[in-house]
Amino acid sequence: MKYPIGLQSFEDIRKSKFLYIDKTDMIYNLTRDGKYYFLSRPRRFGKSLLVSTLEAYFSGKKELFAGLAIDSLEKEWASYPVLHLDLNTDNYKTEGALELRLTLAITQWESIYGRYELEKTLSQRFEGVIERAYKKTGKQVVILVDEYDKPLLQAIGNNELQADYRGLLKSVYGALKSQDRYIRFALLTGVTKFGKVSVFSDLNNLQDLSMDEEYQALCGVTQDELETIFAEPIKQLATKYKLSVEEALCRLKERYDGYHFVENGIGIYNPFSLLNTFKRLQFGSYWFETGTPTYLVELLKQDNYRLPNLTKEVSTADVLNCIDTASNNPIPVLYQSGYLTIKSFDEEFGEYRLGFPNKEVEEGFTRFLLPYYTGLRNPETPFSMGEFVRDLRSGRPEDFMQRMATLFADTNYKIVGNSELYFQNAFYLIAKMMGFYTKVERTTSNGRMDLTIETNDYIYIVEFKLDGSADVALQQIDEKGYAQPFAMDKRQLFKIGVNFSLEKRCIDKWLIA
């Protein structure tokens, strides 16, 4: 089986006989149900391949679809002029970058369909290209825009540049409305959907597929597709890891499944991670290896967001579906970017509860944020966390606390915010990382407790005070009965009282009992 890792050309995949998961029945329905569409999905989720497939279909390349579902559905195989704008190729952090990219694309189309010199602005030239493409071919035009939002995302934090980009894109996309009679089909894809002063505000007939139940599996891999198409590599993976097929499926589900794009929808697997897993026959964090956008940190910084709330967020469809550039709320971006997903839906109130989709995202996002909030630098993070965990597994609470104190003392405070929030966020990330290797709990039934860590041989109960006293923290462990649930447990139990100085932004004292 040839895996199309990194390949986004439908034609190349089909001609070179790479694996293609057949979504063409949905594509056929899509081209008949409506005219103007928008789809947001996380990066590396197959959006570019979808656009390429549509380009091949509307170009009438019937031979590429032999044996696929659409082969028996489509009878005409007409060819239409296709204008494909790919905004994923450039860097848009400098003024003029977007205008140059649009100019190059329109100039290329004009070389095919001609240009009138009186058309001066990009929007006028785009309108002219659409009209002339129709008149030259006698066929309505298909417009495909891939990663429409990349310029806007790269301009987060630069309000002036983002406003310029938004205005430019709005004027260009406005051509779709003015030239409607010449257009057969249009699809715009991206990671996010920007609202308020939207680039789509003139396109009031744009159908959003992002939370459409019928098309929830248009990108990504379903459980049925996984078990039928990848049956053989799943067996190979199970053999390598000495697992049963059922156990291998469970591990794949834990690591790569869990994306839900509609209420009560089916789980969708990240295709990029699955393909890499089967290609290498190794469980890994492949989605994060391709890079995590720094604009996420910018948003978290601007909002002074409390990271422990990440898995407690409740939101509505209106909020999730639309990003307001005037707002610092990071949740819509985190959801649309694939770092959070729908976990449950309250039908009565129309509210979605969010959380991490799977272990790959949860662990990868935690590792990504750790250097921004603590003294753990990126290259050293795996080693440093290993030392933390080895201390815990070996029953060395003093060494563990020494490392903890050093970690806070070394922090370079890339994230600006009040000291209490800084401590809570840093401590949350550290506890989260340790939780991937040990059992970590942050609450009890009798009230709030900062941290309980369990290994095979030891139990640690840690109470933190902010500008308080390590003695009082230790005393509170007994008063609140935090150790009571472990009264019959044979493992050695350590109680640790810790004080964090908000002024110094460091751990200034701890006591162990």
Where do the protein language model's features map onto the residues?
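Structural motif
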Residues: 142, 458-460, 494
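Active-site metal-binding core of divalent-cation-utilizing nuclease and nuclease-like domains
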Residues: 133-137, 430-456
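Phosphate-binding site recognition
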Residues: 1-419, 434
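Short, mixed charged/polar active-site loops
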Residues: 448, 459, 506
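Conserved catalytic cores of phosphodiester-cleaving nucleases, focusing on short active-site segments
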Residues: 427, 451-466, 480
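Domain-level recognition of nuclease-like catalytic cores that cleave nucleotide substrates
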Residues: 485, 489-513
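Metal-dependent nuclease catalytic cores in nucleic-acid-processing enzymes
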Residues: 172-179, 332-340, 428-432, 476-496
